[in-house]
Design a protein with these regions (language model features):
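Conserved HGGG/HGGXW glycine-rich cap/lid loop of the alpha/beta-hydrolase fold
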Residues: 9-65
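Conserved acidic catalytic loop of the alpha/beta-hydrolase fold
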Residues: 70-88
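Gly/Ala-rich beta-loop-alpha elbow adjacent to hydrolase catalytic centers
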Residues: 92, 96, 100
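Flexible "cap/lid" loop of the alpha/beta hydrolase fold
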Residues: 101-106, 111-142
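Conserved alpha/beta-hydrolase catalytic His-Asp/Glu region
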Residues: 124-130, 144-197
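Short beta-strand/loop motif that positions the catalytic acidic residue
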Residues: 199, 205-207, 211
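Catalytic histidine neighborhood in serine/cysteine hydrolases
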Residues: 216, 220-241
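Catalytic histidine-centered segment of alpha/beta-hydrolase-like enzymes
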Residues: 238-251
Length: 317
């Protein structure tokens, strides 16, 4: 895996190559570039994916005392410069979404579209900051015990996903010295909700309905405030990292969005209308299924009328 020196540290990245416009994906807190393996595996031929490890994650180590998500946006810009990529689809999950939004604000000319998964534009809720702080204190003081590991996995990956053990094993290997700064960057980030209208790039927002880290309402508000949020996809039962736990649904949403970027404006409008129509029909079917079979009221009435007419005819004879 190649490394590139940018802004004072070595950035670890992976470039699949391909003839199509690059799709650049940034991972979430405590994760790394490998979390997007399902999306890369499902991509059509020629699709180019660039994934990278942010500071304090994966094989990229932080060499500064402090950094912000704006700094990570600068890291991404330096990486794209190194690769000769002028414009790309910029995406991210959770923390990666924080970076993608700031990159779009700072370098709008480099963004052809955005893919935002399990993320938001606001700051962290105080009660969640306190919870994360307590978990961090235990991790730093005692190491990652099984109970804490399972709690973190439940927040990020849900309780039932079979791949959790792979990530727990990675967390056990993570140097404790990198935890504090990554956490500080998370909880001290600035609120950019009011600036979302400045982002003009077409955007896809994907969010799990069971996300324990970021409430889906925050993602819906983000989509509403973005200037060009073309589609909001709610992954039923999906948690925080639904691109891993519900990969097929997320892959389909991303593939359809990328295909739509190649269409003309009227074609894209028609595609959005068809998507909305299909979603309404799906929800209507789900409501019918949940309510059970409808009562048959018309047929029995018709049957009684027929029986009455038959009786009257017999009496007349």
């Amino acid at each position: 895996v190649p490394l590139y020196a940018v802004n004072g540290q070595w950035i670890n990245y992976e470039d699949t190559g391909g003839d199509l416009e690059p799709v650049v994906l940034a991972h979430g807190l405590l994760m790394d570039r490998e979390m997007f393996a399902p999306q890369i595996a499902a991509a059509k031929a020629g699709c180019r994916f660039i994934t990278w490890d942010a500071r304090c994650h994966g094989d990229t180590e932080n060499t500064a005392d402090a950094f912000s998500y704006w700094d990570l946006a600068d890291d991404l810009k330096g990486l794209l410069d190194h690769l000769g990529v002028e414009r790309a689809v910029i995406g991210g999950m959770s923390q990666g979404g924080f970076v993608a939004l700031r990159f779009a604000l700072k370098y709008p000319e480099r963004v052809s579209a955005l893919v935002l998964m399990g993320t938001q534009a606001g700051i962290e809720d105080p009660e969640k900051v306190a919870m994360y702080q307590a978990m961090l204190d235990v991790w730093e003081a005692q190491g990652l015990n099984d109970q804490l590991a399972r709690t973190i996995a439940a927040i990020i990956l849900g309780n039932e996903w079979r791949g959790s053990d792979q990530w727990i094993a990675k967390w056990h290997q993570k140097p404790r010295s990198l935890l504090r700064q990554a956490f500080q960057t998370l909880v001290t980030r600035d609120d950019i909700q009011k600036r979302l209208g400045e982002i003009k790039a077409p955007t896809l927002v994907i969010h799990g309905t069971a996300d324990a880290a970021i409430d889906i309402e925050k993602a819906q508000r983000m989509c509403s405030d973005l200037a060009n949020c073309e589609q909001f996809v709610a992954i039923e039962g999906g948690g925080h990292a639904c691109n891993l736990t519900h990969a097929k649904l997320v892959n389909l949403a991303i593939q359809q969005f990328l295909a739509g970027l190649e269409l003309t404006a009227p074609q894209r409008a028609e595609q959005r209308a068809n998507t909305i129509r299909a979603d309404v029909e799906r929800r209507s079917r789900e409501r019918r299924d949940q309510s059970g079979p409808r009562r048959q009221t018309v047929a029995p009435v018709d049957r009684r009328l027929a029986e009455r007419r038959a009786l009257e005819e017999r009496r007349a004879r």
